[in-house]
Amino acid sequence: MFAGKVVVVTGAAGALGRAVFEYFANGGARVVALDYSHELLDSAFPVKDSMHQYQEVDLTSRDSCQLVLSKVIDDLGQIDVLCNIAGGFLMGEAVHETSDATWDFLFNLNTRSIVNTSSVVVPQMQQQGSGKIVNIAAKAATQGFANMGAYTASKAAVMRLTEAMAAELREQQINVNCIMPGTIDTPRNREDMPEADHSTWVPPSQLASVIGFLASDAAVAVHGAAIPVDGLS
């Protein structure tokens, strides 16, 4: 389905990032796996396929994204799909007690990272005349929760950012959409919430399938969507 396509996956060393990488790789794409350290990438991908790239990048730095993604374009000649998977979560204090460091961390990683990657990738997609961008919001983006103000605000910003980009780019055949996962069934989440009913959580592979749909030609008419994918929660 994705033969001949170049797909960039941020946060590729995480559980969801790996699932998305595998989905597109199995579909025949050349996948560029991005994460913040070579050590993480080496751990996530101990056996590397020469068809793909594995690059260290600081997604919170526009300069770092410019350097790495410009080289990807120079090397491969195109970027057809950008999957902005990287993100973070911190349970914090009440809004009025939340530190600047927490606000900066969550907005830089969850929201500004999308701006930073898009600043390089969108001009390339405009030159190509097509492209697909898929962002990760969250079910929590639709409602504020106590002691999660910075997180929910950063993910709500992803939804609005997705809508704005979709409105700006749809006439140039560039689709921008996002998904809103509930609790993802990852080893880290199981460790953090051992008493929870894990059967209600959504597996990364199912999220990857929805992302794959949004990145496919079947979704050419979908712009600015925020799709809930929250398992049985």
Residue ranges and their predicted role:
Residues 93-95, 99-107:
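Substrate-binding pocket helix/loop in short-chain dehydrogenase/reductase
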Residues 118, 154:
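Active-site helix of classical SDR
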Residues 27-43:
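Conserved glycine-rich Rossmann-like NAD(P)H-binding loop of the short-chain dehydrogenase/reductase
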Residues 138:
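Residue(s) in the substrate-gating loop at a strand-loop-helix junction
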